[in-house]
Amino acid sequence: MGKVVGIDLGTTNSCVSIMEGGEPKVIENSEGVRTTPSMVAFTNQGERLVGQAAKRQAVTNPTNTLYAIKRLIGRRFSDPLTAKDQGLVPYKIVKADNGDAWVEADGKKMSPSECSAMILQKMKQTAEDYLGESVSEAVITVPAYFNDAQRQATKDAGRIAGLEVLRIINEPTAAALAYGLDKKDGQTIAVFDLGGGTFDISILEIGDGVFEVKSTNGDTFLGGEDFDMAIIDYLADQFKKENSIDLRKDSMALQRLKEAAEKAKIELSSSNQTDINLPFITADASGPKHLNLSLTRAKLESLVDELVQRTLAPCRTALKDAGMTAADIDEVILVGGMTRMPKVQAVVGQFFGKEPHKGVNPDEVVAIGAAIQGGVLKGEVQDVLLLDVTPLSLGIETLGGVFTKLIEKNTTVPTRKSQVFSTAADNQSAVTIRVAQGEREMFSDNKTLGQFDLVGIAPAPRGMPQIEVTFDIDANGMVHVSAKDKGTGKEQSIHIEASGGLTSEEIDRMVHEAESHAEEDAKKRALIEARNNADSLVYSSEKSLKEHSDKLDDALKNQITAAIEDLKAVMPKEDPEAISSKTQALMELSMKMGEQIYKENPEAAGMDPEAAAHAAGMHGGAATGGGDGANKHGKGAEDVVEAEFEEVNDDKK
């Protein structure tokens, strides 16, 4: 049985680890270093360089040296953050035929997955050189807030690199595994993971081999690269003041600034001042120009204060979602190279009211956790149970543009949820299932992941077909959706992939807007549900009136006809209370109609008085989730809610 490697595929650096003798071990690369720069370069000679070799030549070959590729993985070219990234890097970001963001180097267009695969191949080779045998299986880590497209793209990168990816594991969860493997007593911990390109915060309860994630949040476009850019902008602005030359327009000068910024940032974690000297950075008609200035820790902290403060909003949300306060956290674990910055440590300590735990190596702990997870999957590590969560709610569009959630955010994965819907029109032979992620009440306010059609539905009156929609999120956090017509057995499924990733800004916007627009959303939904109820009742009442006209007295027929017209008149209005009131009035008359039909010919009706009343039009709860009087289709049928496909109320099964 071959070894399973644990790989931390980072934005700035990557790391590989294995289980050896029951203990995780980080493997040094061919340069003798335990972390490898996540960089790929293509030389004029057609040679491909990965890791430290690529980093060494970046200044002289900036347009063909690719770094921070992880920020593009699973993203669309039209994504606003792709445009932001274009202003930060010297290499070309181009639009692929499918609309994804790709990169171009040495005249060749490549997907971010392909570039990431080159880094994974380097990590694979590092492990093989140490073990003296081939490696084919891996556990790869991703930010907890990565969406489905980004996770799928990461898994694709593993496959391109020749690895069978046994599991995609969230970085904070991997760090918690490494920290808590030997912890027997129960603890509640917060994993604060600020890396090179992404930020995650996860709240976990750990103890006696059980690692349960209570909530997770984050920002997939916040990390060390942004801190570097803040320094680069400062250096470029200072130089421009003195020399009237913008160094950001020179790709080679920009690469030198990046190296200097990264070096200064690291030095200022242990000293109060550093000197930045870049001779011959550029030239003009008067001759060569040199950049020479001092940067203090205080100045650096003022430059990046806004970035550090941005980490706190996800922390507050994660605590709120977990139903906890900062006082409930026993330990705060710092993960990612940026947590070495004193300013970050101070802000985290102040927020949680306790000194952060610094007993783990922030650059290696994620890879170690990935190796432990590999050991768990292979049976080398016993008595460990890992319970992770999905970061966003998942659902589908139903009648009126409502977003019907099937799986709520922070639900433990793997998970599977099914719900039965129905058609919205008579003889409807196909339905379109549209899938989204988000927290808003209306589908259009959330992020569409994809859609598919279920065709071949047998012709039937609306509300009769039973269409079971199933959401399945696997242990990798990847989404599968299927729909099945329970009558015909027809089934259609979609594996959501590379449909344009959700950005951290979009996620934050969804959550914040969901909170600020909660009242507005509730009113909008109430109006749609009231109209759906009314429409369903009008339809069934008119049908019953037509079919059983000879069994009803004229007075009741006139009353029902008038009530139907009254209800139709108020339905277009933006007044859910008025619609509900008229719906209730028609429902009461429908009950009387059912009673008359039953009294007139109980055997022909073939049902009890309550069922007769239903047949006569008692469909008042049809679109609300199956309240009292929800439509029943035959004996033993499930209560369904009329939506774009009617929703079954599971509680009444």
UniProtKB/Swiss-Prot annotation:
Function: Acts as a chaperone.
Sequence ranges of Acidic residues compositional bias: 639-653
Organism lineage string: Bacteria, Pseudomonadati, Pseudomonadota, Alphaproteobacteria, Magnetococcales
Record-linked Gene3D superfamilies: 1.20.1270.10, 3.30.420.40, Actin, Chain A, domain 4, Substrate Binding Domain Of DNAk, Chain A, domain 1
Transmembrane portions of the chain: none
Name assigned to this protein: Chaperone protein DnaK
SUPFAM superfamilies per UniProt: Actin-like ATPase domain, Heat shock protein 70kD (HSP70), C-terminal subdomain, Heat shock protein 70kD (HSP70), peptide-binding domain
Organism: Magnetococcus marinus (strain ATCC BAA-1437 / JCM 17883 / MC-1)
Gly residues bias: start-end ranges: 618-629
Induction conditions: By stress conditions e.g. heat shock.
Phosphothreonine sites (modified residues): 198
